[in-house]
Design a protein with these regions (language model features):
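Low-complexity, Gly/Ser/Thr/Pro-rich intrinsically disordered linker/tail segments
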Residues: 218-219
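Sec/Tat signal peptide C-region and signal peptidase I cleavage site
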Residues: 32-36
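Acidic/histidine-rich, surface-exposed loop or edge segments in extracytoplasmic proteins
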Residues: 64-96, 122-132
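Mid-length scaffold segments of soluble, non-membrane domains
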Residues: 98-162
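N-terminal secretory signal peptides that target proteins for export/translocation
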Residues: 1-12
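Short N-terminal segments immediately surrounding and downstream of signal-peptide cleavage
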Residues: 37-65
Length: 219
């Protein structure tokens, strides 16, 4: 009976070591995801409402086809990250320069995904009336995709002058204003909200960047 005791102790030790290793491994795996998941409830809803995961430092789900009915994974390569980092480096001097750099990153994204998705055929202000969902983004798609890009920029430490704001919405049927929504940046110094709105622009055109105060008055 005594001869059987040591193996039991070894087995217990192995079990404890395995459990500890599992906890450590889980912490390592969950750590970055938890950091990437630091989002407001409004931003979280952008993803949960269409059953997709938020972006991470390595990939994002690209929505198209109107309300994310079609989707494609963008796995960022080393070349992608280098290109985006170089674009954003030009915006370090000021908040205005950073917003201009973000515009260029969105154009980079449009060029990167256009031939893959077929959105290189897309038109400005596309919606169901165009009967061409497979080549287009609606404003929900552009809001999700642009917000995802902003979250990736934040994860990579490339946003110096701005935080990421909650999506903004507009639409007043009394004055025939079309319902619409957009991604938002918040100037850290002034707290002014700025939209980054790709939907009103065609393929490879820079997204609208303007204050929310102005944006809510436009059609």
């Amino acid at each position: 009976m005594r001869d059987a005791a040591p193996p039991i102790q070894v087995s217990r030790t192995r079990t404890i070591c395995a459990a500890v290793f599992g906890v450590v491994l889980a912490a390592l795996l969950v750590g970055p995801a938890a950091k990437a998941a630091e989002m407001s409830s409004a931003i979280t809803y952008l993803y949960s409402s269409v059953s997709i995961y938020p972006p991470s430092a390595t990939s994002m789900t690209v929505c198209y086809g109107f309300v994310c009915r079609r989707r494609e994974m963008l796995d960022f390569t080393a070349a992608d990250r280098s290109a985006i980092t170089q674009i954003m480096a030009a915006g370090r001097a000021s908040a205005a320069a950073e917003r201009a750099a973000v515009q260029k990153v969105v154009v980079w994204f449009d060029r990167r995904m256009g031939p893959i998705l077929g959105t290189n055929k897309r038109v400005a202000k596309a919606d169901f009336r165009y009967f061409d969902d497979k080549h287009n983004y609606d404003c929900w798609d552009t809001t999700r995709n642009t917000t995802s890009l902003l979250l990736v920029l934040r994860e990579w430490g490339l946003l110096k002058h701005h935080a990421i704001g909650d999506p903004r919405y507009r639409g007043n049927t009394l004055v025939l204003q079309t319902p619409h929504n957009t991604a938002v940046l918040v100037d850290r110094a002034t707290k002014v909200e700025w939209v980054v709105d790709l939907w009103p622009r065609g393929y490879l055109q820079p997204p609208d960047v303007m204050t929310v105060e102005r944006w809510v008055t436009e059609d």
